[in-house]
């Protein structure tokens, strides 16, 4: 059985990677990762979609996870979005306001265009 429901995963770390692998096994064909971190050297032993070379090259977690899903199953539609949104209550500079507004708007669009959302942070 194949499911066309698009899934959005906030977090491409240990939990996000394992959620994505399970979803693929259940037939989900569209997965989008959102994360702002890079793969570190301690990640590949825990995160099923990253490798040592990803840490060496400081690749983004979302990009790495999306690419790994496509290597595992080329028919999957996996996307990566890298953005940063500060924690509520944290201050930002005036020069960061426009970028923050763009990122929040992008998050709104992503959530609106996905049927299932996982918060795996």
List where the protein language model places each region.
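Adenine nucleotide-associated cytosolic modules
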Residues: 1-121
